[in-house]
């Protein structure tokens, strides 16, 4: 169980990675309480002064000019939650919901949303008791915030909707009972504060970001293994090459490969004097390609850490200034573009891996047995495993198409430009799964190739990586049922086993 004290607006990527990995016990710093109380009092004062302020005593969207009577204000907030809970599709994973609630608590507790502490505490209690609202994955365009997903989250606070507890779907009323909560009657603006925000898009994007980091680490390990398995040159990783180009991430990527390849590989030393001038690009240009991918990962890290700590509600309550202002912080364009760039990186990591794997099974290029198996003809070896990798790489090319360039007006053209951030971020999970599958196939192939170089050994780190695989999958001496081997290699990568082999500071959240 991860213990997380939220300092409003100060969540780190390392903390959020832990939230994504395991159940979390939340608490809030005492400093947050007065800020929320002052903000909530500012909203209450609007009602007392009989002012007209959007979201407090008006309708929403195109109905923003409709004044709501004082006796209907509680109904207004309840109605917006129930009417906006219009999502569709399979439910988000518990980890996604947990992340989404943590992000929402972080945003609301900064004191710009006019929401009472008891509502924020109730959200934390759901996480602390591992009661997760059932939230359909589909139904948000990422502006005016992630309305439908956040509405589904909020229904449980009212004793409505559904939740999941210990794998079972239960009613919202049962969820509150398990969490030790009573149904909440929302005060003015609180329903809107819960629904407005980019927390669903950002939760999906953070999951994709952490997966991209894991895949980058795995690809560096697999790529280094393939270099030695194919008797590739270490010269392309010379720091001088990358220093004169100047891209920091390329320089760091090359450093990662040198770290893995080491100085004392018997395989590397065995062909130092060979006459081969240049390796194919999939080996030689790894620092350039992976460096570009690393740059996209790092850029996304900056954007997503800011967004994770952002106030993306509307309107915003600036109690110290006596002002409540309507704006557009709910528009998730930064998240959409960060997710699109992550999609490019994830696709390219997989594409390069598939090409290395194809090189390994080609005996003319790798000088290894055809399809990495003895007695070819009788045995087909890795022939169709490479086809699987190719299929996954091709699928990712379609999924990598930018989502942020799409927009479809909603709410009778009041919300006439939207970000599509939720889809942009959500598809990263499928893309990461595809790339992980490609890398699993390469990992098996590279380990097979290294074993064919016996008795010569690779570097200490590469031998360690190979040993971790061989504890689960044995050498492929003849054809056997292949799918279980891919599944075991895939699971090894899913556990982020190779993150520990990366140099410190290479990846933002590690």
UniProtKB/Swiss-Prot annotation:
Annotated metabolic or biological route of this protein: Amino-acid degradation; L-histidine degradation into L-glutamate; N-formimidoyl-L-glutamate from L-histidine: step 1/3
Subcellular location: Cytoplasm
Gene3D superfamilies the UniProt entry points to: Fumarase/aspartase (Central domain), Fumarase/aspartase (N-terminal domain)
Reaction catalysed by this enzyme: L-histidine = trans-urocanate + NH4(+)
EC number of this enzyme: 4.3.1.3
Record GO cellular component, one term: cytoplasm
First-tier enzyme category under EC: lyase
Pfam family, one: Lyase_aromatic
Record GO biological process: L-histidine catabolic process to glutamate and formamide; L-histidine catabolic process to glutamate and formate
5-imidazolinone (Ala-Gly) crosslink, residue number(s): 143-145
Family per record: Belongs to the PAL/histidase family.
UniProt-recorded name of the protein: Histidine ammonia-lyase
Organism: Photobacterium profundum (strain SS9)
Species classification: Bacteria, Pseudomonadati, Pseudomonadota, Gammaproteobacteria, Vibrionales
């Amino acid at each position: 169980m991860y213990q997380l004290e939220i300092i409003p607006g100060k969540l780190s990527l390392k903390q959020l990675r832990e939230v994504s990995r395991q159940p979390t016990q939340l608490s809030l710093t005492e400093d947050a309480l007065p800020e929320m109380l002052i903000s909530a009092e500012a909203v209450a004062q609007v009602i007392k002064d009989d002012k007209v302020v959007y979201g407090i005593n008006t309708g929403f969207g195109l109905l923003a000019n409709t004044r709501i009577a004082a006796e209907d204000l509680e109904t207004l907030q309840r109605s917006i939650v129930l009417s906006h809970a219009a999502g569709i599709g399979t439910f988000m994973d518990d980890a996604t919901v947990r992340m989404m609630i943590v992000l929402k608590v972080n945003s609301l507790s900064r004191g710009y949303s006019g929401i009472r502490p008891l509502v924020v505490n109730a959200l934390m209690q759901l996480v602390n008791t591992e009661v997760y609202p059932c939230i359909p994955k589909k139904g948000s365009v990422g502006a005016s915030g992630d309305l439908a997903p956040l509405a589904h989250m909020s229904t449980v606070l009212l004793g409505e909707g559904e939740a999941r507890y210990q794998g079972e779907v239960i009613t919202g009323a049962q969820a509150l009972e398990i969490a030790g909560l009573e149904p909440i009657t929302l005060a003015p603006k609180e329903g809107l504060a819960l629904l407005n925000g980019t927390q669903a898009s950002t939760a999906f994007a953070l999951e994709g970001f952490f997966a991209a980091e894991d895949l980058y680490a795995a690809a560096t390990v697999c790529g280094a293994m393939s270099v030695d398995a194919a008797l590739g040159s270490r010269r392309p990783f010379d720091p001088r090459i990358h220093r004169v180009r100047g891209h920091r991430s390329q320089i760091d990527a090359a450093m990662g490969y040198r770290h893995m390849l080491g100085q004392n590989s018997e395989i590397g030393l065995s062909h130092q004097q060979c006459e081969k001038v240049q390796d194919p690009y999939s080996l030689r240009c790894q620092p350039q390609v992976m460096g570009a991918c690393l740059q996209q990962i790092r850029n996304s890290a900056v954007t997503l850490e800011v967004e994770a700590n952002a106030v993306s509600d509307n309107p915003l309550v600036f109690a110290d200034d006596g002002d409540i202002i309507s704006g557009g912080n709910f528009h998730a364009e930064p998240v959409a573009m960060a997710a699109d760039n992550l999609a490019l990186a994830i696709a390219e990591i997989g594409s390069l891996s598939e090409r290395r794997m194809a090189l390994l099974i080609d005996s003319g290029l790798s000088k290894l047995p055809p399809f990495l198996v003895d007695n070819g003809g009788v045995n087909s070896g890795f022939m169709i495993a490479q086809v699987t990798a190719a299929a996954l790489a091709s699928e990712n090319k379609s999924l990598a198409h930018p989502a942020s360039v799409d927009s479809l007006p909603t709410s009778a053209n009041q919300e006439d430009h939207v970000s599509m951030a939720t889809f942009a971020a959500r598809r990263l999970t499928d893309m990461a799964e595809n790339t992980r599958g490609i890398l699993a196939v390469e990992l098996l192939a590279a380990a097979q190739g290294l074993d064919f170089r016996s008795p010569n050994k690779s570097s200490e780190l590469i031998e360690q990586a190979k040993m971790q695989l061989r504890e689960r999958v044995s050498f492929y001496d003849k054809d056997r049922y292949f799918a279980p081997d891919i599944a075991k290699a895939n699971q090894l990568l899913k556990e982020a086993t190779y993150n520990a082999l990366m140099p410190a500071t290479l990846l933002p959240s590690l």
